[in-house]
Curated annotation (Swiss-Prot):
GO terms for biological process: tRNA threonylcarbamoyladenosine modification. InterPro entries: ATPase_NBD (IPR043129), Gcp-like_dom (IPR000905), KAE1/TsaD (IPR017861), TsaD (IPR022450). It comes from the Bacteria. Substrate binds at L137, A138, S139, G140, G141, D170, G183, N281. Fe cation binds at H115, H119, D309. Its EC number is 2.3.1.234. Pfam families: TsaD. Coiled coil: none annotated. This is tRNA N6-adenosine threonylcarbamoyltransferase. Belongs to the KAE1 / TsaD family. It catalyses: L-threonylcarbamoyladenylate + adenosine(37) in tRNA = N(6)-L-threonylcarbamoyladenosine(37) in tRNA + AMP + H(+). Binds 1 Fe(2+) ion per subunit. The keyword Acyltransferase applies.
Length: 357
């Protein structure tokens, strides 16, 4: 089974061809990613209109490269998959419309992939992992703990009630004057900092649910930074180290609860899996080893290039859905919001927050 995957939900334009073999294993035949960092850097964050226009300019060329590198012709494709959401709607429209055109012209089945499902299934692209497993999804737009029970079968066990983890890293970087994209810059600065200098809060620690909150921690960093004038490089490193240490401790606690909830409902997970751009953070990757060991399960984290947004994960999710007999109509709409767990409810008291979607 050969599938072309297209990713345009945020600020990466990507296309890939993945082969799903009869035994369920995979081969990545091509995986082309073009980051839009240069386009958005002057603004300190992603500008949706600029992102959408860049996708329009870049996508056709990237698809051509992905097809050429894979050695596969359009008529050989078993399916074409595109991220149909959630994401910045302009970019989602570009990718999904392009996939529909390819499907229509070549008579190829279309799969409209939930971007979060693609992250959830990526470990099966790299590790031959069987269901069920526990997913920690941490990116610029989402922070969730999810029970992955099968293709199309997901139960959300915990979510952020305010900032996503990647968003918090980026905002801390911006308030400290670090370059965009901020997450890797915070990680880099934290490596040489003193994590004990500032006593930052550990949000949601000890709660019986598995939800996250990072807004208060972000504010605490801002308040400490405001007390220091001038803000020297050493101060920035210490602030980043303290912030990251607080995130690590809170994450370990939240995941501990999430894994317990998983086991109570579904039995012991086959693995703890981390995905999303934040999973590329080396300190977080190291911290999760201890979390998995405490829960007596293994830890699986895809290579960093497959944690961040890419076309291979979309192609693989499309292949998984095709193998399960799932295809989509050419009338399938793009979605800015799209729950991975369609039955997920916002935590009590947080119905009007991002936890509701």
């Amino acid at each position: 089974m050969l599938v072309l995957g297209i990713e345009t939900t945020c600020d990466e334009t990507a296309a890939a061809v993945v082969e799903r073999l009869p035994d369920g294993s995979a081969r990545i035949l091509s995986n082309i990613v073009r980051s839009q960092t240069e386009e958005h850097a002057p603004y300190g964050g992603v500008v949706p209109e600029i992102a959408a226009r860049a996708h329009v300019e870049l996508l056709d060329g990237l698809i051509a490269r992905a097809m050429t590198e894979s050695g596969v012709g359009f008529r050989q494709l078993s399916g074409v998959a595109a991220a149909a959401g959630p994401g910045l709607i302009g970019g989602v429209i570009v990718g999904l419309t392009t996939a529909k055109a390819i499907a229509l012209v070549h008579g190829t089945p279309l799969t409209a992939v939930n971007h979060l499902e693609a992250h959830a299934l990526t470990p099966r692209l790299t590790s031959r992992l069987e269901f069920p497993y526990c997913l920690f999804l941490a990116s610029g737009g989402h922070t969730q703990i999810v029970a992955v029970l099968g293709v199309g079968n997901y139960v959300r066990l915990g979510t952020t009630v305010d900032d996503a983890m990647g968003e918090a890293f980026d905002k801390v970087a911006k308030m400290l004057g670090l370059p965009y994209p901020g997450g890797p810059e915070v990680e880099r600065a934290a490596a040489s900092g003193d994590a004990t200098r500032f006593n930052f809060p550990r949000p949601m620690l000890g709660r019986p649910d598995a939800n996250f909150s990072l807004s208060g921690l972000k504010t605490a960093v801002r308040n400490e930074a405001a007390r220091i004038d001038p803000l020297e490089p050493r101060d920035i490193s210490d602030l980043c180290a303290g912030f990251q240490a607080a995130v690590l401790e809170a994450t370990a606690d939240r995941l501990g609860v999430g894994l317990r909830l998983f086991e109570e409902r579904f039995g012991r997970p086959r693995a703890l899996v981390a995905a999303g751009g934040v999973a590329a953070n080396q300190a977080i990757r190291a911290s999760l080893e201890g979390v998995a060991a405490k829960a007596r399960t293994s830890l699986i984290i895809p290579p960093p290039a497959l944690c961040t947004d890419n076309g291979a994960m979309i192609a693989w999710a499309g292949a998984e859905r095709l193998a399960a007999g799932l295809t989509d109509s050419l009338e399938t709409p793009p979605r800015a919001r799209w729950l991975l767990d369609a039955n997920a409810q916002a935590p009590a008291g947080f119905a009007n927050t991002r936890a509701g979607f």
